[in-house]
Curated annotation (Swiss-Prot):
F-BAR domain ranges (all copies): 19-317
Any one Pfam family match given in the protein's UniProt record, by short name: SH3_9
Primary subcellular site in the record, as a coarse category: cytoplasm
Organism the protein comes from: Homo sapiens
CDD domains (UniProt xref): F-BAR_srGAP (cd07656), SH3_srGAP4 (cd11956)
GO biological process assignments: cytoskeleton organization; negative regulation of axon extension; negative regulation of cell migration; negative regulation of fibroblast migration; nervous system development; regulation of small GTPase mediated signal transduction; Rho protein signal transduction
SMART domains: FCH, RhoGAP, SH3
Compartment(s) of residence: Cytoplasm
Protein name: Rho GTPase-activating protein 4
Expression by tissue: Predominantly in hematopoietic cells (spleen, thymus and leukocytes); low levels in placenta, lung and various fetal tissues.
Keywords linked to the UniProt accession: Coiled coil, Cytoplasm, GTPase activation, Phosphoprotein, SH3 domain
Name of the gene: ARHGAP4
Amino acid sequence: MAAHGKLRRERGLQAEYETQVKEMRWQLSEQLRCLELQGELRRELLQELAEFMRRRAEVELEYSRGLEKLAERFSSRGGRLGSSREHQSFRKEPSLLSPLHCWAVLLQHTRQQSRESAALSEVLAGPLAQRLSHIAEDVGRLVKKSRDLEQQLQDELLEVVSELQTAKKTYQAYHMESVNAEAKLREAERQEEKRAGRSVPTTTAGATEAGPLRKSSLKKGGRLVEKRQAKFMEHKLKCTKARNEYLLSLASVNAAVSNYYLHDVLDLMDCCDTGFHLALGQVLRSYTAAESRTQASQVQGLGSLEEAVEALDPPGDKAKVLEVHATVFCPPLRFDYHPHDGDEVAEICVEMELRDEILPRAQNIQSRLDRQTIETEEVNKTLKATLQALLEVVASDDGDVLDSFQTSPSTESLKSTSSDPGSRQAGRRRGQQQETETFYLTKLQEYLSGRSILAKLQAKHEKLQEALQRGDKEEQEVSWTQYTQRKFQKSRQPRPSSQYNQRLFGGDMEKFIQSSGQPVPLVVESCIRFINLNGLQHEGIFRVSGAQLRVSEIRDAFERGEDPLVEGCTAHDLDSVAGVLKLYFRSLEPPLFPPDLFGELLASSELEATAERVEHVSRLLWRLPAPVLVVLRYLFTFLNHLAQYSDENMMDPYNLAVCFGPTLLPVPAGQDPVALQGRVNQLVQTLIVQPDRVFPPLTSLPGPVYEKCMAPPSASCLGDAQLESLGADNEPELEAEMPAQEDDLEGVVEAVACFAYTGRTAQELSFRRGDVLRLHERASSDWWRGEHNGMRGLIPHKYITLPAGTEKQVVGAGLQTAGESGSSPEGLLASELVHRPEPCTSPEAMGPSGHRRRCLVPASPEQHVEVDKAVAQNMDSVFKELLGKTSVRQGLGPASTTSPSPGPRSPKAPPSSRLGRNKGFSRGPGAPASPSASHPQGLDTTPKPH
C-alpha cells in the first residue's frame, strides 16, 4: 500500500510539473503573438496616420480650390453684387461703403485661407506622409527582428527547462536505485541480525554438532551485508550527484526564467519601440507647426476683418449712398396744376354754397391732425424703445457661437446640442428676437403711415385754410340776400312717392330691379350719393353705428318709395344713412352672393398671386345675374373711392372689408363663422381694392356706374321749397285749395315737362324736359294719368307745367287766398311764387351713366313768368324778416336778424319738411297710401321705352 501511495504521489508531482511547463509554453507563445500584435498595431496606426495626412491634404487642397472658386465667384463681374453698374462702381472703390469694405476684407481673407490651405496640403501629402511611411517600415523591421530574437530566447529557455526535466528524471532514477539498494541492505542486515540471535542458544546447547555449519552461514551473511552495503553506497553517491545536478539545473532554470520575464521581455519590447515615439512625435510636431502657421495667418486675417467690422458706419454709409445715387434719391419736381380747356382757376374756391362743406372739413382735418400728431409721437417713442431692445437682442447673439465648443480637453470638440441648455436659451432668444422684430416692423409701418398721413393732412389743411381766408374776403362783396337766394335755389323737393310691387328691405333685389325699373335701387343710389356728398371724410363711416330710431325712419321712408335723403337729413345722419345701406344689403333674401358660390369664392382667397385671385373671382362673379352684378359694381366702386380718403375717415380697404364682409357674404349655416370670417374679409378686401379688374366694364355690362364727383340733386329756382321756407304760415290754406281747383280741370290737357324724369316702375312714364305730355285725369295729389309717345302711365305733378288757362285759375284762387291771409309781404310773395311755373333747375338731369348730375336748365321764354316788381322790391325785407324769425326760433336772438353776417356761421333757413313729411311732395288729404290708389286700376301698364 505504501508503494502504491508513493507511486501516486510521484505521478501527481510529475503532472504538476508538466502543467507548469505547459503553461509556460503558452505564455511564451502569447508573448510572441502580443509582440506581433503590438507591431501590427503600430504599423496600422502609422498607415492610418499616413492615410489621414494624404486625405487631409486632399481635403485641404479641395478646400483651397473651393475657397479660391468662392472668392473668384464673388469677385468676378458675374456675382450678384456685381450684376449692376451701381454695384460695380461700389466694387471699384469698396471703401465707399463700410459693409463693402468688410466684404472686400472677407474675400481677401478667403483667398489667404486658400493659399494657406494649399501650402498645408503640400506639407501633409509630402514630407509628413512620407515620414510616416518610413516610420512604418522601421517599426515593421524592428518588430520582426525582435520577434526572431525573442523566439530564440524562448527556445533557449525551453531547452533549459527540458534539461531540467532530464535532470529531474535522472535524479529520480538514481534516487530510486539508492532507495532500493538501501532497502536490500536493511533486509540483509535484518537477516544477519536474525542469524546472529539464534546462534547464541544454539551454541550453548550443541556447539559440538553444528559448529562448522553455523560459521559458514554467518560468513555468507556478512559478505552479503557488505556487498549490499557497498551497492547502497554506490547508488547513494550516484543519487547525490544526480540530485546536485537537478538542483543546479533547477536554480539555473529559475534564474533563466526570471531573467527572461523580468529583463529580456522588456528589452525586447523596448527594441520594438526603438525610435517609434520619437519619430511619431516629430511628425506630429511638424503637423502642429503647419497648423499653427495656418492658424496664425487666419488670426491675422480675422484681425483685419475685425478692424473692418469696427469701422462699420451706418450713417456714413447712408450719406455715401445718397451721394452716389443723388439723381435717384433727389426729390422730383413738384406736380404742377394743368387746367383743362381754358380753365383759369388755379386755386381752391370757397363759394358760399361750398363753405358749409369746406369749413367742417377743415375743422375735421384740424382735429384729425392734432390726434394724428399725438398718435405718431407716441408711436415714435415706442419705435425707438423697440429698436433699442432689438439691437440689444441682436448684439447679445454674437457670443452664442462660442458656447457650442467645449472648454475641457476631450476627444469631442462640440457639445451635444440636443440636451444643451445653452441651445435652448439660444432658441428662446431667437424667438424673442423675431417677436421683437415683428413688433418693430409693425410700429415702423404705423409710424411711416402716420407720418405720411400727417404730411397729407397738413397739406390739405393749409390749402383749405388759405381758401377759407380768401373766401372770407370774397364773401364781404356778396350781399346776404344773394347768398340766401342761391342757398334756396339749391334746395329741391323730393321725388313723388313711388309704389313698388316688390319688397325693398328683406326682399329679392333682382325681382325688385325688374319690377321697379331701377338699375340701382333708390336706397343704394341715394345712400351712396348722400355719403359721397357729406361723408367721404367722415371718421369711422360704416364702423360707427347710427341711431336706431333714425335708421328705422329712413328705412320706412324708402319702403314707402320716398327719398328721405334729398331733404331732411344732415351730416349728423351719416352714420344712420350708412347703417341703412348695410341694413339693406344684410336683409336681402336671397343674399347677393348665393350660398352655392360661397365655397368657390372662399377658395380664391387662398391664392397667393393677386392676378390669379382676381381672375378667379371675376370668373365666378360672371355667374351672377346681370342686375346683381351691376349693383355690386356700383357698390364696390364706391367703397374703393371711399377707401381713398382713409387718411381722413380712417377706413382703409381692410376696415371696410371687416364692415361689409358679414353683410355681403354671410357664412352659411353649419360652418364655423369664426374660422372663415378672416378669409371672407380678405375676399371682400380684394373686391374693394380691385373693382375695375374684378367686375366687367361698361362695354360688357351696361348699367349705371358710380361717379366719384357728385353734386346735390338740382332744384328749382323758385319752387315749392321756397314756398315752404318763406310762407309756412299760408301753406295749409294753399295746399287745401290746390287739389280742389286742380280736380275741376276737365278733358285732356296738354302739359309741358319742365324737368326730365325717369320712371322707376313699369307704370311710370319717362320723359325729357320740354316734352309735351297729355294729361287725362288727376290720379292723386302727386300723380296724373296721361300719355306720352303713345304710351300711357303715371306722370308726376311736380315735373310738369300746366297750360296757361288752367294756370290762371290756379293763380286766381291763390291770390284770393293771399288776400284773405292779409297783405303782408310774406303772404304776397308766397301767393305769387306758388302758382307760377317753375323754370329752374332740373331735379335730376341724368348723365350718360344713369346718375343724377347737377345742371342748371333755364326755362323757355314763353314759360317764364317774371316776378312782380313790388314783390321784387320787398324781397330783401322779406328775407331779413324771415331770417329774424328763424334766428328767434333757433335761439340766436334779435341781434342776428338786424345785420346778417356773411361769415362762416351763415344762418340757414330751417327745413320745412322732415322725414316722411315733405310738404311739397306729400300726398294730399285724400291721396291713397296703397299702390292701387296711387296707380288706379285700368291704367295701361305698357312698359316704358328705353
